[in-house]
Amino acid sequence: MSRRGTTEKQIEKPDPIYRNRLVNLLVNRILRNGKKSLAYRILYGAMRNIRRATKKNPLSVLRQAVRRVTPNVTVKARRVGGSTYQVPIEIESSQGKALAIRWLLVASKKRPGRNMAFKLSYELIDAARDNGNAVRKREETHRMAEANRAFAHFR
């Protein structure tokens, strides 16, 4: 067993324009091949589209979208006596937020549209209104956890 202590969780830095940690989390998930300026351009373009389409503060739309997509429980495969069970597990808010961001990005990549900023903005707007593929994914996960509640004692 390791004698090394556990490291403290690093606090995410806020982004330069909105000064928000959630925006920076989203940028870091969009990031590919170290092109952070491109990731910022995509997200800020999406924020402009949100402001144009909804006439609301894009940061509040983003927060509401992430809140609506964040799951409370998830299922984890657990092997017991030769068979695999999907065991429902409650997850903490940081893990739920990470899942929500991942689902939002996957759903927006699957959308038809001109570019990623456009697709992301409309996925965020839909999620804030409680519909869209990311919200469907959360509901599906909750249904799966509810269906497998009988296996919760395997935790």
From Swiss-Prot:
Stored InterPro entries: Ribosomal_uS7, Ribosomal_uS7_bac/org-type, Ribosomal_uS7_CS, Ribosomal_uS7_dom, Ribosomal_uS7_dom_sf
Keywords from the named record: Chloroplast, Plastid, Ribonucleoprotein, Ribosomal protein, RNA-binding, rRNA-binding
CDD domains, per the entry: uS7_Chloroplast (cd14871)
A single Gene Ontology CC term: chloroplast
Chief location category: plastid
GO biological process, one term: translation
Subcellular location: Plastid, Chloroplast
GO molecular function: rRNA binding; structural constituent of ribosome
Presence of keyword rRNA-binding: yes
A Pfam family that the UniProt record links to this protein: Ribosomal_S7
Cited PANTHER family: RIBOSOMAL PROTEIN S7
Family named by the database record: Belongs to the universal ribosomal protein uS7 family.
Known role: One of the primary rRNA binding proteins, it binds directly to 16S rRNA where it nucleates assembly of the head domain of the 30S subunit.
Binding partners and assembly: Part of the 30S ribosomal subunit.
Name listed for the protein in its UniProt record: Small ribosomal subunit protein uS7cz/uS7cy
Gene: rps7-A
